[in-house]
Amino acid sequence: MTKKKAHKPGSATIALNKRARHEYFIEEEFEAGLALQGWEVKSLRAGKANISDSYVLLRDGEAFLFGANITPMAVASTHVVCDPTRTRKLLLNQRELDSLYGRVNREGYTVVALSLYWKNAWCKVKIGVAKGKKQHDKRSDIKEREWQVDKARIMKNAHR
């Protein structure tokens, strides 16, 4: 009988796209796998990824991640030509792809990458169907966030 591996401390999250939640209303989230090359996996293990400008395009019945930047490590990629911003294929079920096609074809909707993380030994990306926010929506979100902080401060001082 084999022993269970000890859980490694640390976060499984590689990269977050905080700007996406500020710029868009996220209506639905999907988890997708990524088709990666060897040097990309090694760079992701080192945490050298940025998905702040990334988005998903659907074409020919497949989904592709554009704009994600995975910086190559100097020691990992000496004999391979590395393109840090290459297009990466997303691995989704046909049912999930059909759902994405149906939602994105509506006016004003897009698909953005929300986070990049490890699930067991596999690299996953969380994508969301998003609708752009107007300026007044962003302001109301900031006011709501500030009110939550003020409310927490008031409650903390009330218990003293």
Curated annotation (Swiss-Prot):
Pfam families xrefs: SmpB
Gene Ontology MF terms: RNA binding
InterPro entries: SmpB, SsrA-bd_prot, SsrA-bd_prot_CS
Keywords tagged on the record: Cytoplasm, RNA-binding
Phenotypic effect of disruption: No visible phenotype during growth on solid medium at 16-42 degrees Celsius on rich or minimal media, no peptide-tagging of proteins translated from mRNA lacking a stop codon by tmRNA, i.e. no trans-translation. 4-8 fold increased susceptibility to a number of antibiotics (norfloxacin, gentamicin, trimethoprim, tetracycline and streptomycin but not ampicillin), very significantly reduced production of persister cells. A number of bacteriophage development defects.
Location of the protein in the cell: Cytoplasm
GO annotation, biological process: trans-translation
GO CC terms of this entry: cytosol
Major localisation: cytoplasm
Keyword rRNA processing: no
Entry keyword annotation includes Cytoplasm: yes
NCBIfam families tied to this protein: PRK05422.1, smpB
Physiological role: Required for rescue of stalled ribosomes mediated by trans-translation. Binds to tmRNA RNA (also known as SsrA or 10Sa RNA, 363 nucleotides in this organism), required for stable binding of tmRNA to ribosomes. tmRNA and SmpB together mimic tRNA shape, replacing the anticodon stem-loop with SmpB. tmRNA is encoded by the ssrA gene; the 2 termini fold to resemble tRNA(Ala) and it encodes a 'tag peptide', a short internal open reading frame. Able to recruit charged tmRNA to ribosomes. Does not play a role in transcription, processing or Ala-aminoacylation of tmRNA.
Record-stated family: Belongs to the SmpB family.
Note: Although the Fu et al., electron microscopy paper indicates this protein came from E.coli its sequence maps to T.thermophilus. The same situation holds for Ramrath et al.,.
Subunit (UniProt): Binds tmRNA. The SmpB-tmRNA complex binds to stalled ribosomes.
UniProt protein name: SsrA-binding protein
Organism this protein belongs to: Escherichia coli (strain K12)
Lineage summary: Bacteria, Pseudomonadati, Pseudomonadota, Gammaproteobacteria, Enterobacterales
